[in-house]
Amino acid sequence: ALCNCNRIIIPHMCWKKCGKK
Protein backbone atom coordinates (compact mmCIF):
# COMPACT_ATOMS: atom_id res chain seq x y z
CA ALA A 1 0.00 0.00 0.00
CA LEU A 2 1.20 3.49 -0.80
CA CYS A 3 1.61 6.01 2.02
CA ASN A 4 -0.25 9.25 1.38
CA CYS A 5 1.32 11.89 3.62
CA ASN A 6 -1.24 14.45 2.43
CA ARG A 7 -4.01 12.68 4.33
CA ILE A 8 -5.13 13.99 7.71
CA ILE A 9 -4.96 10.47 9.15
CA ILE A 10 -1.72 8.63 8.39
CA PRO A 11 -1.18 4.97 9.38
CA HIS A 12 1.61 4.60 11.96
CA MET A 13 3.49 2.45 9.45
CA CYS A 14 3.75 5.51 7.21
CA TRP A 15 4.83 7.95 9.93
CA LYS A 16 8.51 7.20 9.38
CA LYS A 17 8.17 7.74 5.63
CA CYS A 18 6.14 10.89 6.21
CA GLY A 19 8.55 12.15 8.87
CA LYS A 20 5.92 11.95 11.60
CA LYS A 21 6.58 10.62 15.10
Curated annotation (Swiss-Prot):
Miscellaneous comment text of the record: Tertiapin-Q is a stable (non-oxidizable) and functionally similar derivative of tertiapin whose Met-13 residue is replaced with a Gln residue.
Listed name of the protein: Tertiapin
UniProt PTM: Oxidation of Met-13 results in the loss of biological activity. An amidation at Lys-21 is suggested in Ref.1.
Pfam family, one: Tertiapin
Disulfide bonds: 3-14, 5-18
Originating species: Apis mellifera
UniProt GO MF annotations: calmodulin binding; potassium channel regulator activity; toxin activity
Site (Is responsible of pH dependence of the channel block): 12
This protein's GO CC annotations: extracellular region; host cell presynaptic membrane
Superkingdom field: Eukaryota
Keywords: Calcium-activated potassium channel impairing toxin, Calmodulin-binding, Disulfide bond, Ion channel impairing toxin, Neurotoxin, Oxidation, Potassium channel impairing toxin, Presynaptic neurotoxin, Secreted, Toxin
Function of the protein: Presynaptic neurotoxin that blocks the inwardly rectifying Kir1.1/KCNJ1 and Kir3.1/3.4 (KCNJ3/KCNJ5) potassium channels with high affinity by binding to the M1-M2 linker region of these channels in a 1:1 stoichiometry. It may block the potassium channel pore by occluding its alpha helix into the channel vestibule. Tertiapin-Q also inhibits calcium-activated large conductance BK-type (KCNMA) potassium channels in a concentration-, and voltage-dependent manner, in addition to inhibiting Kir3.1/3.2 (KCNJ3/KCNJ6) heteromultimers potassium channels.
Intracellular or extracellular location(s): Secreted
